[in-house]
Amino acid sequence: MAVKADPGGFPQRKTSESRWVTAAQMRDVQRIAQEEFGIDILQLTENAGRSAATLALAMLGGKGRGQRVVILCGNGNKGAAGLAAARHLSNWSVRVDPIVSGVEEEAGFTVRRQLQILRQSGIIEPRDMESSDITVEDQLAESDLVIDALVGYGLEGPPQGIAAAVAQLAIDAKRPTLALDVPTGVNATTGEVSSPAIKACTTLMLDLPKKGVLQDQARNHVGELFLADLGIPVGVPERMGIPMGGLFSEGPIVRLRR
């Protein structure tokens, strides 16, 4: 079954209906949510993962059985969201191949927690995190969909090290790709495209839309645009002068049309 970049069935909004934020503004929103409202980062990554899994399943035609999804995960919170998505997709009968681009001992707390959950659930074994380039190439070639959860919105400049190598493998594989927040290699604030940069058919932005995604230079890398509510109280961005305007009044995932 062909992957649908815009599977339909989600509420639609115009891009002009929302305030688009920089990476710095997004950091402030998350900081206030955590420090003043007690929102835990594990909550945010879990919500992001479920949203990613929901959209991925829709892109696959709404049926998980017989589908294979490779999830490229970094060592930070975005990678943790990708691992959470792997668990949900596995629950929905999708065959998942989560790949962490780094040494587990050096990964952030949220990644290690999600890996622990996946292992306890029997979804992955420790050796699955030690794939060689050849194994990753094979997994990508056999996938129906790739989820890009390699680097977060705060990255400036090109991806480095293992993340760059994995991104290049994904680019070479030319599989339909769902990017979380912004595709790897695209600057969330300016839209500048580095090398390597993943070319997504669909981008699911998280909580607030990022300015860089709308820029002309990023258009060929972001594909169709969606936005997911992560559960941050609307009062947090609004007190920073970022009105939400009932953006999620019809559902937690919305399709954004230019």
Each predicted region: which residue ranges?
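YjeF_N-associated NAD(P)HX repair module
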Residues: 2-21, 143-258
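A cross-family phosphate/adenosyl-ligand binding-site feature
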Residues: 2-145, 151, 155-161, 219, ...
